[in-house]
């Protein structure tokens, strides 16, 4: 495998958009996965996803760990825009990077799951699509207007910092930032994981996204992880990665 760090997708004043990439040992173009870290949109670092990226690379995927801008310094839509721009950057430069431009996926957990789901359901008009070709959402929020049944203050505080406003101040922003309300027939195939004992992000969030995708005819699966909370055991995370690799291999072989 080849590891390249501090690659620049956007050279901009103050905050470059950087990514690290782990490439499999091959000379042919390969499918790719954008690995998006969690942290409530306000913390975390792309290096946290290196173990995940290594697993994908070992199985023939180029894995890109993105360092998106964090709130509250950079509120919505900064994080989503950064992830979308990386998709565009990879498609524009697919030949030189060594990846397939039509086999780009996103994988994320928690806040990263929200961003991965956003990449599956959202696009920006233009010649080059910013929507991924498949996504894996691991316990991500999908409806920011209704974050948590049991512990509302946990999620509300993170969301307010992420969006930069209270719900009653800018309801439309809270709706716009929610992947659930962007699902269409064109949304990318999505694999969703959620622990049934998650006390940070309500499992209903994932169930509702799955149901919305099923209603629109989007290829999707919902895997409930029995006995798992928001942080997974090693065995559960191995299952997540193995099933994600199988899912992407299946989608990209069509």
Where are each of the predicted segments found?
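Alpha/beta-hydrolase superfamily serine-hydrolase fold, recognizing
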Residues: 1-254
């Amino acid at each position: 495998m080849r590891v390249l760090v501090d690659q620049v997708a956007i050279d901009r004043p103050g905050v470059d958009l950087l990514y690290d990439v782990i490439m499999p040992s091959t000379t042919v173009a390969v499918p790719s996965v954008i690995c998006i870290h969690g942290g409530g949109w306000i913390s975390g670092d792309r290096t946290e996803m290196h173990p995940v990226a290594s697993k994908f690379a070992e199985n023939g995927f180029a894995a890109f760990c993105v360092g998106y801008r964090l709130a509250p310094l950079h509120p919505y839509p900064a994080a989503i825009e950064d992830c979308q721009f990386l998709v565009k950057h990879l498609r524009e430069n697919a030949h030189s990077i060594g990846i397939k431009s039509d086999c780009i996926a996103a994988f994320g957990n928690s806040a990263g799951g929200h961003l991965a789901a956003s990449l599956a359901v959202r696009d920006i008009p233009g010649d080059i699509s910013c929507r991924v070709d498949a996504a894996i959402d691991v316990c991500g929020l999908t409806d920011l207007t209704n974050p948590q049944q049991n512990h509302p203050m946990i999620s509300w505080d993170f969301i307010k910092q992420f969006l930069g406003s209270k719900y009653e101040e800018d309801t439309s922003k809270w709706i716009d930032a929610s992947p659930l309300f962007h699902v269409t027939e064109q949304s990318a195939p999505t694999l969703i994981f959620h622990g049934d004992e998650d006390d940070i992000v309500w499992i209903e969030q994932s169930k509702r996204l799955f149901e919305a995708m099923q209603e629109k005819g989007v290829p999707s699966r919902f895997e409930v992880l029995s006995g798992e909370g928001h942080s997974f055991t090693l065995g559960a995370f191995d299952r997540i990665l193995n099933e994600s690799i199988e899912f992407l291999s299946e989608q990209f072989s069509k």
